[in-house]
Swiss-Prot record:
It comes from the Eukaryota. It is found in: Secreted. Belongs to the vitelline membrane family. The keyword Signal applies. GO terms for molecular function: structural constituent of vitelline membrane. Residues 42-81 form the VM domain. The keyword Signal applies. The gene is Vm32E. It comes from Drosophila pseudoobscura pseudoobscura. Transmembrane segments: none annotated. GO terms for cellular component: extracellular space. Keywords: Secreted, Signal. Residues 1-19 form the signal peptide. Disulfide bonds: none annotated. This is Vitelline membrane protein Vm32E.
């Protein structure tokens, strides 16, 4: 623990020393260069390619209309006529009550067995 504290103090001292050294001995930052004058010669752009997939020239030919699809044999709602099974939901109250009763009976039987074994092991 002492080593960690010592290292922390050394690191802080080194950081403080570097910060003070760089601020007192550093040269001032140079001023940014001025923007160059617009002395560029105008170079014409190359002509647009005519035999490439993508070109500068717009292709204004209208796209042909798609043909109407043939109607399906089962009708518009045919995919939804079958009943969807429901896997998530509440169990009927009677089944739920029977389930809890069976669990309670099993716990009671286990408790009675353990009590019976405890009584048999004791001597009066």
């Amino acid at each position: 623990m002492k080593t960690v504290a010592f290292l922390a103090v050394v690191v802080l001292f080194a950081a403080f020393a570097c910060a003070s050294c760089s601020s007192s001995y550093a040269a001032p930052a140079p001023a940014p260069a001025a923007a160059p004058a617009s002395s560029y010669s105008s170079v014409p752009a190359p002509p647009c390619p005519k035999n490439y997939l993508f070109s500068c020239q717009p292709n204004l030919v209208p796209a042909p209309c798609a043909q109407q699809a043939a109607p399906a044999a089962y009708g518009s709602a045919g995919a939804y006529t079958e009943q969807v099974p429901s896997y998530i939901g509440f169990a009927p109250y009677q089944q739920l009550q029977q389930y809890h009763q069976r669990i309670g009976n099993a716990a009671l039987i286990d408790e009675l067995r353990s009590l019976g074994q405890g009584i048999q092991g004791q001597q009066y």
